[in-house]
Amino acid sequence: MGKYFGTDGVRGVANSELTPELAFRLGRMGGYVLTRHVGEHPRVLVARDTRISGEMLESALIAGLVSVGIEVMRLGVISTPGVAYLTKAQGASASVMISASHNPVDDNGIKFFGSDGFKLSDDQEEEIEQLLDTAEDTLPRPSGEGLGTVSDYFEGKQKYIQYLKQTIENDFNGYHIALDCANGATSGLATHLFADLDADISSMGASPNGLNINDGVGSTHPEALAAFVLDKKADVGLAFDGDGDRVIAIDEIGQIVDGDKIMFICAKYLREQGLLNNNTIVSTVMSNLGFYKGLKELEIEDVQTAVGDRYVVEAMREGNYNLGGEQSGHIIFLDHNTTGDGLLSGIQLINVMKATGKKLSELAAEMKTFPQKLENIRVSDKNHVTDNPKVSKVIDEVEAEMAGNGRVLVRPSGTEPLVRVMVEAATKEETDEYCERISAVVRSEMALND
């Protein structure tokens, strides 16, 4: 990735790193690159999550788009996958989502989608970066009727909800579903969707105020929903992240059902229905060893990619696969949408429950997980973790002790100044000990001095 774009668009602290000035330039440069071959007044959709900085960045971004002659349709607050779907459904030339997903409220981000609803290629992002770095802005500056326009398309939310309902064959009558919307983009979507599907609903994290997105709620804090599920005696819980492209489930006894287990459950069901393309699922290197052992027992093939849903989607498109995702809850059903979609994944999961008549705890128990621990360490330069000799040495030592019965993954985050240390081993005690041993060296060698 380059100077501006990470694995999921441009991100930074809003108003200091991701400034209105940068948003304006991203609108101009990004809009130009994505629409220059379209003709006069190409259409671009713009949406945001619930962060307090969203409207500021939206205004600046739209000004940039309009300045190169683009017709902007504002969707307001809607999930990232909602934007991806509507891009194709509305015949737009491109779309832009303003969100930092699961990151804290101080952060924000800008990510583009092409006319096909997919995230941009590396080449497209590189071209935008080159324009951003050009000293003089020589892009067109139309005037009069050559300028773009701005209109609102808030009814797009309902069109997206109606589409989601068409992807399953069952309603959810008789199910009590607990929803955690992370005080984010699904707050105005999830309850309407599940009510339309005749479910009994209890919701939390659905009162955004601009400052509380992901704050102790959502897919990065599933323990909050676990307690809520038990309190409300719900059959299942679904926790989304700030922009709605992830989901983590909770079963009826309060156990967390992560992305690996959701993918496993859905892969098994799709295979039984003859709907799993090429009998293959795509995952990342972060998926649990138990996930792969479970797939092997079912004789389902797997393809592994680097961490990041964009890499999962690339592999799915290249291999004509229709199911893939990440342990973190990004799950892609490529028959139905072009990116991870928390609402879509949630209804697919509950559809399996309804079709099989099984509780979520029963379905999840069919995949056994290895104990796993993940440490996130804030560092001064995350990209040097792979060539630090002391870090490499402790990893080699731990892997030798494991003797093949576990694994270690140490990598820089694609979206934050963090090094992620992930360890799986035969027992929880070994997992904790190995993870702390490696993390201690990473902290000693690389951690920021607070």
UniProtKB/Swiss-Prot annotation:
It comes from the Bacteria. The active site is at S101. One of its GO terms (molecular function) is magnesium ion binding. It holds the Pfam family PGM_PMM_III. One of its GO terms (biological process) is carbohydrate metabolic process. Catalyzes the conversion of glucosamine-6-phosphate to glucosamine-1-phosphate. NCBIfam families: glmM, PRK10887.1. This is Phosphoglucosamine mutase. It comes from Listeria monocytogenes serovar 1/2a (strain ATCC BAA-679 / EGD-e).
